[in-house]
A protein has these predicted regions:
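Long, positively charged, glycine-interspersed low-complexity recognition regions
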Residues: 114-117
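Short beta-strand micro-motifs in enzyme catalytic cores
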Residues: 23-25, 47, 84-88
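Catalytic core of non-heme Fe(II) oxygenases with the double-stranded beta-helix
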Residues: 39-53
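Core segments of cupin and vicinal oxygen chelate
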Residues: 1-33
């Protein structure tokens, strides 16, 4: 994978189906769990942009801001398995998915790659997960 070999990203976690097919790969370039991720999907596209906030209170405040602007959260708030971060998703005016996230896992340089099962709970501990493929 170019992101790993060409750029130098380190794989933090992968998500696999029971048959072993990789459906997601989370990579890091610093101490945060991931700064880049790829997802198996039926279409070749940018999945989403993510913007980081500091903490749960920021997630709340941003959700309130979007509510006052009549922008609906279409996923979340929730907590991802890989990365253990808080999140929610909205759509921008062009229909692109935008994630706001906080409190992502901080990892040491010696952290081994983890493997997660491809299931809704992996993508959202608190509720419905958004599986890109079955």
């Amino acid at each position: 994978m170019y992101a790993q070999k060409g750029v130098g990203f380190i794989i933090s976690d992968i998500v696999r189906r029971e048959d072993g097919t990789i459906t997601s790969c989370f990579m890091r370039s610093d101490k945060e769990h991931h700064s880049f991720a790829v997802f198996l999907n039926d279409a070749v596209k940018l999945d989403h942009n993510c913007y980081e906030t500091e903490n749960w209170n920021d997630i709340r405040d941003w959700a309130d801001h979007f509510s006052k602007s009549r922008i609906t959260l279409w996923w979340g708030p929730g907590r991802h398995g890989p990365g253990d971060n808080l999140f929610f998703m909205v759509s921008d005016p062009d229909g692109n998915s935008v994630e706001l996230s906080a409190e992502i896992e901080i990892v040491g340089a010696d952290r081994k790659m983890g493997t997660w099962l491809h299931e809704e709970r992996t993508l959202n501990y608190w509720g419905k997960g958004m599986l890109r493929v079955d």
